[in-house]
Amino acid sequence: MKIKSSEFIISAVKREQYPDDNLPEIAFVGRSNVGKSSIINSLTNRRGLAKVSQTPGKTRLINFFLLNKDFYLVDLPGYGYAKVSKKEKASWGATIERYLLNRGPLKKVVLLVDCRHKPTADDVQMYEWIKHYGYEVVVIATKSDKISNNQIGKSEKLIKETLGLPKDYKLKFFSSLNKKGKDELVDYLFDDLVEEI
């Protein structure tokens, strides 16, 4: 699939602010600083589409981007940043949960984890949440340029074991810097969304 057009539509907090045209949605979620904005910009070929923040925990809203005028890519707030109050953390959690609850157009959720580290308790909880709400989960290990090829196997084993993924699960590794395998990843993530239209 070619991403021919991508445009920012709205930043939302409340359900009534979400787009209501019933186009399919794919949501991206992950810890603060996992490289979410970078991967969105990389996959859509738009450098500044999602704002890359130098301050972790900056994305507090749900951002909707319309791709090819066919479907929405939804950027959910980053979670797990230590330097915010419990109240603020709870607020982000509520924002994400509100979106996941009975969101008809949502077809799949992409969970991003940093391939250099063991998934955190927050990552595990997010994975469980997504499954609990009945959505397809795609796990992508980001920042793969930061580890060597022989560390990939170890990283894959650790991520699968920690999240409880099946042994035959096809975990995807991606680097927004070298963009290796980008076209295949775009097809893997977005093709079936368009088939449904």
From Swiss-Prot:
Residues 22-195 form the EngB-type G domain. GO terms for cellular component: cytosol. The keyword Glycosyltransferase does not apply. SUPFAM superfamilies: P-loop containing nucleoside triphosphate hydrolases (SSF52540). Mg(2+) binds at S37, T59. Its cofactor is Mg(2+). GO terms for biological process: division septum assembly. The keyword Signal does not apply. GTP binds at residues 30-37, 57-61, 75-78, 142-145, 174-176. PROSITE patterns: G_ENGB. GO terms for molecular function: GTP binding; metal ion binding. It comes from the Bacteria. Keywords: Cell cycle, Cell division, GTP-binding, Magnesium, Metal-binding, Nucleotide-binding, Septation. Necessary for normal cell division and for the maintenance of normal septation. Belongs to the TRAFAC class TrmE-Era-EngA-EngB-Septin-like GTPase superfamily. EngB GTPase family. This is Probable GTP-binding protein EngB. It comes from Clostridium perfringens (strain SM101 / Type A). The lineage of its organism: Bacteria, Bacillati, Bacillota, Clostridia, Eubacteriales.
